[in-house]
UniProtKB/Swiss-Prot annotation:
It comes from Oryza sativa subsp. indica. Gene3D superfamilies: P-loop containing nucleotide triphosphate hydrolases. This is GTP-binding nuclear protein Ran-1. GTP binds at residues 21-28, 71, 125-128, 153-155. Its main location: nucleus. Found in a nuclear export complex with RanGTP, exportin and pre-miRNA.
Amino acid sequence: MALPNQQTVDYPSFKLVIVGDGGTGKTTFVKRHLTGEFEKKYEPTIGVEVHPLDFFTNCGKIRFYCWDTAGQEKFGGLRDGYYIHGQCAIIMFDVTSRLTYKNVPTWHRDLCRVCENIPIVLCGNKVDVKNRQVKAKQVTFHRKKNLQYYEVSAKSNYNFEKPFLYLARKLAGDGNLHFVETPALAPPDVTIDLAAQQQHEAELAAAAAQPLPDDDDDLIE
C-alpha cells in the first residue's frame, strides 16, 4: 500500500502499521532495517515516516511499508488516517514498563475499530534490559485475542525477523513461506543474555499451557 508520492513496486507490498505507547522502541525497531531507513519518506499530511522494508522469501520478494508514528501517540490517540488501509500490524510494548503493557488493549481496540480482521503481532521489546517488569508468564493478552506474540530486542536485533515472517505467511496464506536472505541490519548496540532469554521463552511456553486468568488486567498491577 504505497502513498501517492511513493514509487510502486512490481512485487507484493503491504501497509504495516506499528502502534504502542511512546518510548516502547517502535522507531528503533523499524530503523534496524538499513535499506528501509535509507529509503524512508515523510508523509506530512498524516505526520508519519513510512519505511519500505523489503524481505526475500522462497516465493519472491515482498515489501512492508512500515508506518511509524513519529511520536505523535505521546499527544493522545492516533488519527484514523494512520490506520486506514492497514493490511497488518505490530503492537509494541516495553517489558520494562508495566504501563505500556496495560495500554495494549486500548491500542488493539483502536486498531480493530478501523482495520478489521488483519493479522496482528504483539511484540514485547527491550528483553535485553535486566530490570524486566512484565514477566513472560504475565503476557496473556495475545491468547485472549488470538494474536501472535514475540519477545524482541530492537537494539540487539534479537528476533527482528520473526514478526515480519509471521505476517508474510499470513498475508500470503502460506505457512511454509520462509526468508531466504537476511536483510541488512544495523550492527547490534547491545548484547542479549541468551541464557536468560531462553528461560523467559520457556516460561512463555509453560504459561501457554495454563488456563487463561479470569481477570482482564493480565496480572499486571
